[in-house]
């Protein structure tokens, strides 16, 4: 028989950055902190299959948000309202120490046959990062699955007082001109119209 326990320690973002650099951070470590508006959030440290470290929101922000004010996925991630919201409004809510340590991450999507790249400090995850390789992955050629999402139950997130909830991904639905992918409340993927508001769970990388 065994008992499994966990420990909680105070730390700083600079210490976490050093842990990423020297390899002492552990897959699945959870970092809890407050946004400048007082909201408490947690991010989980995880690697992709190439060994790159990411920090991913454990649950959604309290407020839901649409991908675009209009029901369109034209321009995909690069052109969507959500991208501007995360990299302006939400980024400004992060602690100053964390802001200074976040590295711009290159996001690559194939949109209408063309390679489109953006540099983002905060970003939604792609369908490939959450669900692994599939028919959609040719449109996300640089992405691999994050290790924190290998099990279906690990893709479930809560949103404010809603309990388990739907949360957006940055991947546009190829068969539709109006939809992006999202994760439903029991951890599988579908897509819906971009103007609907669902949960927001961003990721970032450190310098």
Sequence positions of predicted segments:
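Collagenous Gly-X-Y triple-helix signature in extracellular proteins
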Residues: 1-207
């Amino acid at each position: 028989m065994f008992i499994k326990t966990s420990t909680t320690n105070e730390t700083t973002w600079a210490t976490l950055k050093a842990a990423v650099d020297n390899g002492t951070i552990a897959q699945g470590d959870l970092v809890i902190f407050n946004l400048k508006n007082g909201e408490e959030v947690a991010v989980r440290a995880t690697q992709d299959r190439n060994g790159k470290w990411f920090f991913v929101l454990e649950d959604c922000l309290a407020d839901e948000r649409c991908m675009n004010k209009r029901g369109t996925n034209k321009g995909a991630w690069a052109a969507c309202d959500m991208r501007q919201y995360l990299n302006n409004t939400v980024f400004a809510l992060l602690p100053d120490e964390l802001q200074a340590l976040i590295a711009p991450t290159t996001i690559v999507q194939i949109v209408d046959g063309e390679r489109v790249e953006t540099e983002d400090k905060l970003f939604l995850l792609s369908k490939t990062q959450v669900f692994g390789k599939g028919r959609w992955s040719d449109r996300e050629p640089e992405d691999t699955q994050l290790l924190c999402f290998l099990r279906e139950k690990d893709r479930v997130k809560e949103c404010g007082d809603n309990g388990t909830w739907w949360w957006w991904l940055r991947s546009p639905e190829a068969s539709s001109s109006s939809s992006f992918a999202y994760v439903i409340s029991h951890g599988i993927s579908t897509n819906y119209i971009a103007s609907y508001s669902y949960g927001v769970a961003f990721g970032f990388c450190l310098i």
